[in-house]
Design a protein with these regions (language model features):
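Short, intrinsically disordered, charge-balanced linker/junction segments flanking boundaries
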Residues: 210-212
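Short acidic active-site motifs
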Residues: 109-110, 136, 190
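Nucleotide-state-sensitive switch-loop elements of NTP-binding domains
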Residues: 1-7, 12-15, 20-110, 115-132
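Canonical P-loop GTPase G-domain recognition
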Residues: 143-207
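Flexible active-site lid/hinge loop adjacent to a nucleotide/diphosphate
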Residues: 114, 127-155
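Active-site-proximal loop->helix
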Residues: 48-54, 135-139, 162, 169
């Protein structure tokens, strides 16, 4: 089936993934597209419960009939997603949604399952989370199709973006340059540009036959 475009949004905890998901959804809704959102939160290893708080940051979307939001706990599964994520994606696809956004828990070396489901993966970063060596250790550079530095109004945002660009240039096997954009999801700055770049990168991947 897979008529919907499936975009993964990942990055470290505190990067503003839910706020950005909310902002991007508004951008696509303004174009008349129906958007399904699957937001994954970590499950406690002690209680087995999960605080499904992603929808709190998307409260202004809850009355929009063109948006479906489903929060899930990881239930102990590694990979940054829930065991039920793939099934939920197929269900939303079957329901005719134009876009499906997968928001993962904080990503690390073992949390890259989103790249197996999504057509395209956006890796989000923010200033002040550590140096470039730590970013490489976290494994986030290997899974992204494009990158964004959120909270661009903070000091160090330009430096973080430039460091990411420098690290990405070290990749010798890349078939295409990987863009790094600056955005402030809470203020709306750069969101439209990111929305358009996501669509452009999807078309590039599709044209190159790189989509599953």
């Amino acid at each position: 089936m897979n008529e919907a475009r499936i975009f993964g949004i990942t990055g470290p905890p505190g990067a503003g993934k839910s706020t950005l998901t909310n902002a991007l959804t508004k951008c696509w809704r303004a174009k008349g597209l129906r958007v399904g959102i699957i937001a994954v939160d970590p499950t406690s290893p002690f209680t087995g419960g999960a605080i499904l708080g992603d929808r709190v940051r998307m409260g202004d979307l809850t009355l929009d009939t063109g948006v479906f939001i489903r929060s899930m706990g990881t239930r102990g599964q590694l990979g940054g997603l829930s065991p039920a994520t793939a099934g939920a994606v197929h269900a939303l696809d079957a329901c005719g949604y134009d876009l499906i956004l997968l928001e993962t828990v904080g990503v690390g070396q073992s949390e890259v399952a989103v790249m197996e489901i999504a057509d395209l993966v956006l890796v989000l970063n923010v200033p002040g989370l550590g140096d470039d060596v730590q970013a490489i250790k976290a494994g986030i550079l290997e899974i992204g199709d494009l990158f964004a530095v959120n909270k661009a109004d903070r000091p160090g945002a330009d430096r973080t973006a430039n460091e990411l660009r420098a690290m990405l240039e070290l990749g010798e096997d890349e078939k295409r340059p990987l863009p790094v954009l600056l955005v402030s999801a809470s203020q709306g700055t750069g969101v439209t540009e990111l929305c358009e770049e996501l669509e452009r990168q999807y078309l590039l991947l599709d044209g190159n036959g790189e989509l599953a």
